[in-house]
Amino acid sequence: MPKMKTNKGAAKRFKKTASGYKFKQAGLRHILTKRRTKVKRHLRAKCMIAASDIKSVKKLLRHG
């Protein structure tokens, strides 16, 4: 049986914390002139994974 491998794309996107997994929101790369400052400020904040997605993220991050 081969070793279980971590999904490297997911490993770069999610970080394990004591209270769950955090990630950076999308939508802050380009075409930002039409967005309000408040929206851009809120997109800068890190978010936590929803409870319904934790099982799938754990499966992707086998060793993390």
UniProtKB/Swiss-Prot annotation:
GO cellular component: cytosolic large ribosomal subunit
Molecular function (Gene Ontology), one example: structural constituent of ribosome
InterPro entries: Ribosomal_bL35, Ribosomal_bL35-like, Ribosomal_bL35_CS, Ribosomal_bL35_sf
Domain of life from the UniProt record: Bacteria
Keyword Ribonucleoprotein: yes
Keyword annotations from UniProtKB, A to Z: Ribonucleoprotein, Ribosomal protein
Biological process according to GO: translation
Disulfide bonding pattern of the chain: none
Xref: HAMAP family: Ribosomal_bL35
Entry similarity comment: Belongs to the bacterial ribosomal protein bL35 family.
Protein name, UniProt field: Large ribosomal subunit protein bL35
Organism: Colwellia psychrerythraea (strain 34H / ATCC BAA-681)
Name of encoding gene: rpmI
